[in-house]
Each structure stands twice: as C-alpha cells, then as structure tokens.
C-alpha cells in the first residue's frame, strides 16, 4: 500500500475555530508558567522498559535539583510498583516542603480510592483525574453519550472531594483533564469542566487545575491557541481556575503549540525533559524553558549543567538524546560549514562580557548551560570527520563514540592544518595512539586486583606516580565505580562505551571513557586489552592523565 493520490478521501482537515477577535497573536510570553514534570508518569509509561524504583528515585531527585515544584510521580492504582514508589517518597521523607507531588487516576471509584490510599500522610498532593471526551472516543471506545461522559467526570469529582475531606492532614489540590481536549467540541469541553467546577467549588485562594491536553496533536499550533483562548473566555470561575497545557508532538509542533497556548492565557505546562512520552513524545520542558531564557525571561528552572541532566535522563529512560536536539544535542553548538565558523569566530571576537549576546548562529551562550567553546570554535571539516571515523572502523576496528569523534576530530584537524596534507589511516591511528593510548603520565597503572561479592566490587591498584609507587584501594557497586572511588582526585564518569575488536581467540576489548575532573571540561580516554575490565581501567587512566596534563599546561 502506498500514499493515496487523493488523501482527502481518507483524511479530513481539522475545523478552524471561529474566533475573529482572538487576542493571542499580539501577545508575548512575559510570565513564567507553573511547570509540572510528567517524566515519571507519562514519560515512564512510554518506555520500552519502564524505570524501576531506583531509577525513578534518581530521576525524581534530578527534577527537584532542576527546580520543578510540581512533579507527577505515578499512576498508583495501575501497579504495585507505582503505588510503592509513592509510599516510599512519602514515608522516606524524600519530598521537599516546596515540592508538590501529583498522581494520576482514571475516573473509577476503585482506582480513585486506591490513589488516596497511596497518598496517605503526604504534606501536599495534586489528585489528577481524567476521562475521554472526544466524539471518536465516546462513540468507538466507550459507547457513551455526552451526559454519560459528564456523569463519569462529576461522580469522580464528588468522590475525590469526599476522600480528600477524610484526610485533612494533606493540603489537597484537584486537577481534571478532559482527555483528547484538542479533538473535543469546545462547547462540550466547557460543559464538562463547568460541571466539575460546580462539584469542587474552587475559589481564588483555593484554585483547581483544568488540564487541556492535545493528547494527539491533530492541527496547527494556532488552532490549539484559539481553543485555549476560547475556553478561557467561556469557563466558569476563571479567577479560580488554573488552565494547564499538556501537548504532544505528533505533528512536530508541541513546543510551538505550548508557547502559543501560553500567549492565549494558559497558566501552567505539563511535559517531559527532552520530550520523552507516548508516540512522538510530550512537549519538551527543556526547550520551552531555554526558549524563554534566550528571550530574557528566566524560566526558574536551572539547566546550568545540561549535560549532567541529559546523562540522568538517558540512563533512566534508556533512550539517547538526538545529537540535533535543541540546546542539548552533541552537535547543536557545532558548525561544520566554513562560512558559519568564520561568522562565529568573528562574533566571539567582538562579544564583550556582560553585553547582549549577538554571536551569529548561536542563539544561546553555551557557557550558560555548562558547555565549553571547544566544539564551537574549532576548524572542522565534515568530510574529514566522517573520513576519520570510517578509516578507524575499517582499518583498525575502532568505533569511537559520537562525542569522542568530535573531540578527536579536533586533534586530527590541528595536525592537517599543521601539515597541510591529507592524512592516511596509519597517520590517524598514530595520532590516536599518541593522544590516548600512550597517555601514561603522570599516573601509570602497574597492576590491579579485583574482588566482587554480593554486588560490591573492591579494587586494589599498584600505581606509579611520577616514578613513586603508590597503593590505591576503592569500593563501589561495580569495577569502574570502585576505581573512581580509589582515585586521588574527584572525578565523574560522564559516558562509557565498549566493543570487541576482532573475533575468536585473538579478539581484544576496546573501552572508551569520558570523565570530568572537578572544575574541568570532560575528556575521553581509550583502553585496549584482552580483558574488558583491564581495558576499561586503562581507558580511565588514559582520560585521567590527559585531564591532569591539560590542567597543568593551562596553569603554566
């Protein structure tokens, strides 16, 4: 089957909203919305392998560090894993006083009751209830008329109000979502929400949240903005309602729809870091926040070390962030075009400290989000970079990780500029050897002994430091963590890759490590050995020696 010659026979365009006096096009975003992360709920449920409790806790703490004050942590009635995670957050006292957790429930009595059980003892909590309202869902999925949908919503609202009153020790907030809002008749969306408002009776001092999801993005962003502005004009008790946006990225315009929705009067945004979520993902909170930042409006979220945040997200979600992803991708601050590089270099030369940022091709100063300028200002050839990677893989079986490709290409580029000649595969490998494999000073790994028991690794190392013999010992959850613990300097592993070189009895292991010493930019190391543990240790020493050597050279 192929694309239809006349798609109008199968698909119908979305109907425009009749709003001739719309005001949002002339507005700008001047206030920061209430942010709510749905990484641990909407994001987690979309993963091939959902997070376990340890990963969820690590992610939760990262969200708190970033500055999120509302965090949707679970769907506690859906699984024991989610229920127990909520209990651990509360009983373990992991929730800061200025953070409110949010949980999701369907509009069913047993699920709502179970949800309140999970929240017992919480200081503050948002109970988020939803039911689908769109015509296709009413007709195809639930076989309900409009009144049936209203009854589901109001019955759930009544039960939530009753159960909340039975647990007065918690400061409750209520949230209702007419699921598939963006595909629901606007008049009916308001009818359902007004019915819920009538049950909950919010006030300006005790507001409720009405979350208006583009559960499936089905129109251009301006249509969503029209829907939000129309809704805001017609909903009851607008001064007692927080209008929340929850967009998805099915058409690739989730960020734009959210920004226009804020211009249309919304107060709050739900989304995920780097846009994880069902199908094409939820709106990316990082992109939204940094878009505001680059317009001079601080988002009240801290991405000063964006690579550290990305590391947590990638490891917990087990999904890589695309190298072209806005602000955080490996390549977003790198220009491969010579004319772009020339403009950037001239921009840096004229950019004065504390002046308005005007460097061409760079919408944000990489330093503001913890990035250095090495990848930005280097002289780089796209064909050279691709050729380096290809030759090393084909001739030597070495497959450099992406960030290491970028780092090593600078070494090769410097040599080609010096020589003014094309480099052969052998010359490139010699550069790799000298830069990484022969980085054996000031620390030389003489020997190591590894003991592993009950998930704990202990490593003893004999090391030569500038000719002086030393003994190091470290303990950790794995060999590398134990080795890092043994180091005489504070270091953090940012990335690790390994693969086999060759096959059979002559196979060797190649390990690549990216580390960051305190106060320095990340650097890579390579180790090759018949034993993978030894290879990884050699890689770490390679990176360590390079970092120490560069720090000494910089200080000299």
Swiss-Prot record:
Q: Per the record, GO CC terms?
A: cytoplasm
Keyword DNA-binding in annotation: no
Q: Name the domain of life.
A: Bacteria
State whether keyword Repeat applies.
no
Name the cofactor(s) required for activity, per the record.
Answer: Mg(2+)
Pathway, per record: Amino-acid biosynthesis; L-leucine biosynthesis; L-leucine from 3-methyl-2-oxobutanoate: step 1/4
Q: Which CDD domains match?
A: DRE_TIM_LeuA
* Major localization listed first in the record, in broad terms: cytoplasm
Gene3D superfamilies in the record = 3.30.160.270, Aldolase class I
Q: Give its E.C. classification number.
A: 2.3.3.13
Task: Tell me where in or outside the cell this protein is found.
Answer: Cytoplasm
Domain Pyruvate carboxyltransferase per the UniProt entry, residue ranges:
33-307
Q: Where is this region: Regulatory domain?
A: 439-556
Give the keywords, sorted: Amino-acid biosynthesis, Branched-chain amino acid biosynthesis, Cytoplasm, Leucine biosynthesis, Magnesium, Metal-binding, Transferase
Residues engaged in binding Mg(2+): 42, 246, 248, 282
A single GO BP: L-leucine biosynthetic process
One of the record's GO molecular function terms: 2-isopropylmalate synthase activity
Catalysed reaction per UniProt? 3-methyl-2-oxobutanoate + acetyl-CoA + H2O = (2S)-2-isopropylmalate + CoA + H(+)
Question: Which SUPFAM superfamilies is this protein grouped with?
Answer: 2-isopropylmalate synthase LeuA, allosteric (dimerisation) domain, Aldolase, post-HMGL domain-like
Q: Which N-terminal stretch is annotated as signal sequence? A: none
Functional description taken from the UniProt entry:
Catalyzes the condensation of the acetyl group of acetyl-CoA with 3-methyl-2-oxobutanoate (2-ketoisovalerate) to form 3-carboxy-3-hydroxy-4-methylpentanoate (2-isopropylmalate).
Oligomeric form and interacting partners: Homodimer.
User: Would you identify the family this protein belongs to, as annotated?
Assistant: Belongs to the alpha-IPM synthase/homocitrate synthase family. LeuA type 2 subfamily.
**Official protein name in the record:** 2-isopropylmalate synthase
Instruction: Name the source organism.
Output: Pseudomonas aeruginosa (strain ATCC 15692 / DSM 22644 / CIP 104116 / JCM 14847 / LMG 12228 / 1C / PRS 101 / PAO1)
């Amino acid at each position: 089957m192929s694309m239809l010659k006349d798609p109008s026979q199968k698909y119908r365009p979305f109907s425009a909203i009749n709003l001739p006096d719309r005001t949002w096009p002339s507005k700008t975003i001047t206030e920061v919305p209430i942010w709510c992360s749905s990484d641990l709920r909407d994001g987690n449920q979309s993963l091939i392998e959902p997070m376990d409790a340890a990963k969820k806790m690590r992610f939760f703490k990262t969200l708190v560090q970033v500055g999120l004050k509302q965090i949707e942590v679970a769907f506690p009635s859906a699984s024991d894993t989610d229920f127990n995670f909520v209990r651990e957050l509360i009983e373990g006292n992991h929730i800061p006083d200025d953070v409110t957790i949010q949980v999701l429930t369907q509009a069913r009595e047993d699920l709502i009751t179970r949800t309140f059980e999970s929240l017992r003892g919480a200081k503050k909590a948002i109970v988020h209830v939803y039911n689908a309202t769109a015509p296709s869902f009413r007709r195809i999925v639930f076989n309900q008329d409009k009144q049936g949908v209203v009854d589901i919503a109001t019955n759930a609202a009544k039960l939530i109000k009753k159960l909340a009153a039975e647990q007065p020790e918690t400061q409750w907030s209520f949230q209702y979502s007419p699921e598939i809002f963006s595909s629901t008749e606007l008049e009916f969306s308001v009818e359902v929400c007004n019915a819920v408002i009538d049950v909950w009776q919010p006030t300006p001092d005790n507001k409720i949240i009405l979350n208006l999801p583009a559960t499936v993005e089905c129109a251009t962003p301006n249509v969503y903005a029209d829907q939000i502005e129309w809704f805001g004009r017609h909903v009851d008790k607008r001064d007692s309602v927080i209008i929340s946006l929850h967009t998805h990225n099915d058409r690739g315009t989730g960020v734009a729809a959210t920004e226009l929705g804020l211009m249309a009067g919304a107060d709050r945004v739900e989304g995920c870091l780097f846009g994880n979520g069902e199908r094409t993902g939820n709106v990316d909170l990082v992109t939204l926040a940094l878009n505001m930042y680059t317009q001079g409006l601080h988002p009240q979220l801290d991405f000063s070390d964006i690579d550290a945040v990305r590391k947590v997200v990638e490891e917990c979600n087990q999904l890589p962030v695309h190298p072209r992803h806005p602000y955080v991708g490996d390549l977003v601050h790198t220009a491969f075009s010579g004319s772009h590089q020339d403009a950037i270099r001239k921009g840096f030369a004229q950019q004065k400290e504390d002046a308005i940022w005007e460097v061409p091709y760079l919408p944000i100063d990489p330093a503001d989000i913890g990035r250095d300028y090495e990848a930005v200002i280097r002289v780089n050839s796209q064909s050279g970079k691709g050729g380096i990677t290809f030759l090393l893989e084909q001739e030597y079986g070495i497959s450099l990780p992406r960030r290491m490709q970028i780092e090593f290409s600078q070494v090769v580029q410097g040599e080609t500029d010096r020589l003014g000649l094309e480099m052969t595969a052998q010359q490139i490998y010699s550069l790799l050897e000298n830069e990484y494999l022969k980085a054996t000073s000031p620390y030389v790994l003489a020997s190591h002994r590894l003991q592993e028991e009950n998930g704990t690794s202990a490593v003893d190392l004999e090391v030569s430091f500038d000719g002086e013999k030393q003994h190091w010992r470290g303990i950790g959850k794995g060999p590398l963590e134990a080795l890092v613990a043994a180091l005489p300097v504070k270091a953090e592993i940012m990335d690790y890759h390994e693969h086999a070189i060759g096959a059979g009895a002559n196979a060797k292991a190649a390990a690549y490590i990216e580390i960051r010493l305190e106060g320095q930019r990340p650097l890579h190391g390579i180790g090759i050995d018949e034993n993978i543990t030894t290879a990884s240790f050699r890689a770490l020493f390679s990176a360590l020696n390079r970092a120490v050597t560069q720090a000494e050279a910089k200080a000299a």
